[in-house]
Amino acid sequence: MRWTTALLSLAASTLVAAQGTPVERPRPVQTYSGVVIYQPPVNYTEPRTLYARTLEIKEKGKNVLLATWENYLPNNNPNPYYPVYESFDNGKSWKERSRLYDQVNGWGARYQPFIYQLPGNLGRFRKGDILIAGNFIPQDLSQTKIDIYVSKDGARTWKFVSSVARGGEAIPNNGLTPVWEPFLYLYKNELICYYSDQRDFVNNGQKMVHQTSTDLLNWGPLRNDVAYNNTEWRPGMPIVSKLPNGKFLLTYEFFGSVEGGFSVYTRLADDPRNFNEAPGTVLRATDGTVPRGSPYNVWTPVGGPNGTVIVSSGDAPEIFLNRGLAEPGTAWEKVSIPSNTSYTRSLNILKSDPRALLVVGGGLLPGQPGVENNRVDATLWEVPSAPKKRAAAFEA
């Protein structure tokens, strides 16, 4: 992998420094902030844009970034689509590549798209195929349905593949039965589709669940990932990353937590299908901050022997860094970055440079000040290297 080469180069530079010769520092990341991916027209329906997601692919030897989001067309158009935009310069400029329309329901590609590239073969689908899982919902919001689409030509055209789950009215009130927020992850030749589920309303206000597929066509039984058996509590918005110690990290928002609001929680598991057996831990920064709402997480090898876990939330522009593999009791550092506050920002570590964190947001939720200015924008930020007190021993 490219990041391995980068780390070996950095280690070589450190060794040279220890021998008393000049250090050749790695080039700084070419950072930026406020790059506009999409500026919706003034007549778009509020909230205009929301819920951005990104993916990096390799195409003809070049790294290409893709982005998609919720797209609120003028006059509450009954047939919204997921735009897919492309960037060939690490996110400094963008243009449209394709549009994904609802092909089977007659409702619209309305909420919560997630874009994912298969890292291995799955049934008749090949490594490199690009998937979008989304919440397909009619204009009157009377139903919710998580469908999967595939592209075999680099996200230029799309074809419906299968439906994972169907729920009721698309309103996040306890007692209703919608499904929300799909997230995909391939594990041991099974594609896992995590999502939030309100259908078990007798026992749970909302819970997080998953289903798996070995062929992308048929989906297995539902399994709980976070279920508190409380009709008021609402854990939701699952995001999963693999860590270098072989464990898997789940972040989620938790309405019902003792900290209040939609506090961000984490869970660690040896198997990404068994999070319900793991304890939940609140994310609390060293300054006492508990981030709230719509978290996202990624891991990068930069930052020390364990790398760095990075978590974003929806209530502030800062991010949270952990160099202890997110284990309970390890420190979370709140760090300012030049990014806007945004509902469920997407985080992505660039393959070309593990120091480069791409942060993409689609704007604020309805009712929040500034929602009338929602747009999709990007920030590229350099992840800090190991703390200086650790590096000093090698720079003598």
Task: Label each region the model flagged.
Residues Y51-R53, Q112-F114, E181-F183, M237-I239, ...:
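Conserved beta-strand position repeated once per blade in WD40 beta-propeller domains
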Residues A12-L15, G175-P178, I192:
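Long, low-complexity intrinsically disordered regions
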Residues Q19-L50, L55-A109, L118-N174, L186-T231, ...:
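Beta-rich carbohydrate-recognition and catalytic domains
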Residues M1-P22, E395-A396:
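Fungal secretory targeting signals
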